[in-house]
Amino acid sequence: MASPTLALAQSPPPKSPAVSVSQRNPHCWSKLPLDLMQLVFERLAFLDFERAKSVCSSWQFGSKQSKPNNQIPWMILFPTDKNYCLLFNPEDKEKLYKTQHLGDDFAKSIVLATYRSWLLMQPRYEELEDQTLDQEFHLYIKDLLTCERINLPAFESDIFGLSHPILWIDDKTKDYLVIGTINRETMVSFKNGDNSWKKFPELPKSSCTDMCLNMIYKDHKLHYLDYSNLYIYDFFGEFPREAFRISVREFVGYATNPYGYDEFPEVPLKLKLNRYIYNMIVTVRGDVLIVASLHFSMAETWEFIICKMDSSKVNKWEEIVSLGDESILLGLGITVLAKDMEGITCNSIYFTADDFYEDYEENEIFIYNLDTNKVEIPHQFVSSSIPSAHARWFLPTFKRD
């Protein structure tokens, strides 16, 4: 489809209609060749794409052969106990879009991961029939715009299902890959064509001191982070193969303030670290970053430390204070180019606390500007009016009709 089947959930009062481009100049724009028109449409973001469709009937027809070139992160909100999502586009802050009905079991599920417009869904723990150890979990993948669904085979887990989840899918071929851990020592994957979940034979074993902190998958490589090392595994063969590792003890130990623990009662409360998250990022240019997100007691917002890997130096990690013309989508493990692009804040971190087992808090999904060290909550009008169970940033993919 040329744009998602979305209904407006909220919008401002209608304004007086403006004179359209076709009324001002009825001959020039309507007679563009279709191939040239498609070149125009393929360069438009969602909002401009929707505006261009209304220029004239020939542009309306041309839009059906194209799709928006969306590079702007949107926000998904999951209203409590509802079988649909709400989508917020920062480029058009006055509107909120509602998806189609996403299935009777959608409200009873949690989203583990996203890839473009695809969601990796798992039943809520309280919805399981038998809440015991070695519980069986049935996951599925859902396109929130087309409602296409892919069911995955069941697996048993002695924790709350799939942890450190990764979803990757090719929109054209529908090839997909799901990765995660099902206990402290076992990592599994499933891809199209498999009959069951496969265990990884060579990945590092977690322990109390070296448990997995974060995983991301990009360009057929799995990046795995624990308290000691960052590992990179190639996924070009039948089984993953370790291609690279680098110590992270210097950075991880530095960023995680020990004052967060009770054995330091003399430390003022405001200096105690009560929560931290580590994320790996692969930038547009291919650099590998680690972002430490830190929340101190009595602090109004989170703090961030960013380090860049440089394996050519003795000191392998270098702290950086600017992303230049890029912005980080923390939960997706990537950066996007943001310079001169309306709707996205340059040199910023698009942050989500990303804990689907905790209650949703509207102040834990925001945009952190590294230039000003200030937080922007662009969706505040939404959060105040619609109770939500969860929210996260994503990059939607729009399809042709």
Curated annotation (Swiss-Prot):
Native source species: Arabidopsis thaliana (Mouse-ear cress)
InterPro entries assigned: F-box-like_dom_sf, F-box_BR-signaling, F-box_dom, KIB1-4_b-propeller
Location of region: Disordered: 1-23
UniProt cross-references to SUPFAM superfamilies, sorted A to Z: F-box domain
Lineage: Eukaryota, Viridiplantae, Streptophyta, Embryophyta, Tracheophyta
Domain F-box: 27-74
Protein name in the entry: F-box protein At1g69090
Segments forming a coiled coil: none
UniProt cross-references to Pfam families, sorted A to Z: Beta-prop_KIB1-4, F-box
